[in-house]
Amino acid sequence: MSQVYVNEKTGADSTDVSGSEQQPFQTPAFALFKNEDAKILVYKQLEDSEEFGYGEISASALKKAKKGAEGLKKKQEKQAKLQEEQRKHQDDAAKKFAEMDLISIKEDESLPQAKKIKLRTVQDNIGTRVVVQGWIHRLRLQKGLGFITLRDGTGFIQCILTGDLAKCKTTHELTLESTVTIKGVINKLPEGKSAPGGVELKVDYYEVVGLAPSGEEAFSNKVQENADPSLLLDQRHLALRGESLSAVMKVRSTLLQAIRRFFAEEGLLEVTPPCMVQTQVEGGSTLFKMDYYGEEAYLTQSSQLYLETCLPALGDVFCVQESFRAEKSHTRRHLSEYTHIESELGFIEFDDLLTHLERLITYVVKYVVEDPVAGPLIKQLNPNFVPPQMPFKRMEYIHALDWLNEHGIPNEDGEKFKFGDDIAEAAERKMTDTIGVPILLIRFPVEIKSFYMQKCADDPRVTESVDVLMPTVGEITGGSMRTYDNDELVAAIKREGLDLDSYYWFTDQRKYGTCPHGGYGLGTERILAWLCDRFTVRDCSLYPRFTGRCKP
């Protein structure tokens, strides 16, 4: 009988170890596993001696070792079986791919010529052989069948692959976000089945335009639904391909079209004011400063002053322009760059301005929800959305203070509201949500509003100003009548500590034929957040810019 040596301190359980006294195993179990009938000698303190050396294993230790060796043997057999299955699977896969290599995709020249279409027109082409191009949005392959949900930005369609098209190697190498050109006939779905638009495309030929990566670089690893928001913003260029974000961007496009439609119907002219300016509108602390050929200049906070200069030449005007605010704010309602819809109207009174704002919001929302593309998207994103109805509730600032105090809602210092306090967003939201209807909050104190706002004739402590408040979202727009008395405007500019000379072109509007006029500004992203039920305005900007975020 052969013998093997075991030393728990210096030994090693390895197939490279011989089990000799010079190369002992580490455990008796492994020693028996390698040499089933061998005599086991373990390194231990020898009987009746203080010395250590190799001696025969005890009966109890041998019993335990045999049990351990049996476990190792079963583990080896299991591993061998698994390796055999893996080898067989690899052989089968290699055989399958070899068979796939023999399958070639060729277009049947006898078929009718395919009509090139965009997916938005699929309903107009049922029964027609078409060619569509786009990105693989979803992909599912099963025995003898392949399902591709194709996206081209204008819509989706389910494409069915059968026969050799489903079996070929090219199909089994497809990945999400790969681009393809697909030809086939559009058919209505059989009863009981569902797919985008209620149709499917029976594919007879396709080509790969660009194969997206698989493995670690796969699209699904780049953009994960529950990933940290900052990581998703880093991958914004890919995240935009998701259904929710792209839907918001489509609603955004329709919203801007609806805005322009309303203004055209009201007879307003669109203008394009400059973004680089040397005057401020909303306070110097939020200006982005820049060196403009050696002079100090800023990115515009608002185009209002320039719009006012257009009234004598062009009549009522509006612009859709980027505005910039250097606010170090991390709230869900603020951006450093946003799309500002602004308008100025000449020869109006305060009540005319309020009525105009009601009409603007009501009609624009109506146009958007009735749009064949944006309407269903809003229903999908915000199923509980209810379009506002005229007239809106009108509430004066002082009456809002009374309401807040009566309902136990304190100011930012935890005290009762008093005249001159700014109503913080949280208190404003609570009031609006409780009342539950759109509110025109009017007549704010002079000291909490901008220098250019017209004072009320019946109470010079307050201005002809308005914030439009919507339930669940808060303020969506603000406006005012503008000071049109030159002396009063000059005094206001000086009171704010602004350089009067820089505003010469603005005060000239009062010198050379002044008139009562007013205007307002809407943040596109805030309107969208309301329409689409988005938690933050960041989801409503193509590439949002805010404190700490200026990429990609």
Swiss-Prot record:
The keyword ATP-binding applies. It catalyses: tRNA(Asn) + L-asparagine + ATP = L-asparaginyl-tRNA(Asn) + AMP + diphosphate + H(+). The keyword Metal-binding does not apply. Gene3D superfamilies: asparaginyl-tRNA synthetase, N-terminal domain (3.30.1910.20), Bira Bifunctional Protein, Domain 2 (3.30.930.10), Nucleic acid-binding proteins (2.40.50.140). InterPro entries: Aa-tRNA-synt_II, aa-tRNA-synth_II, aa-tRNA-synth_II/BPL/LPL, Asn-tRNA-ligase, AsnRS_N, Asp/Asn-tRNA-synth_IIb, NA-bd_OB-fold, NA-bd_OB_tRNA. Belongs to the class-II aminoacyl-tRNA synthetase family. Keywords: Aminoacyl-tRNA synthetase, ATP-binding, Cytoplasm, Ligase, Nucleotide-binding, Protein biosynthesis. One of its GO terms (molecular function) is ATP binding. GO terms for biological process: asparaginyl-tRNA aminoacylation. Its EC number is 6.1.1.22. It is found in: Cytoplasm. One of its GO terms (cellular component) is cytoplasm. SUPFAM superfamilies: Class II aaRS and biotin synthetases, Nucleic acid-binding proteins. This is Asparagine--tRNA ligase, cytoplasmic. It comes from Debaryomyces hansenii (strain ATCC 36239 / CBS 767 / BCRC 21394 / JCM 1990 / NBRC 0083 / IGC 2968) (Yeast). Residues 12-23 have a biased composition (Polar residues). It comes from the Eukaryota. Residues 1-23 are annotated as: Disordered.
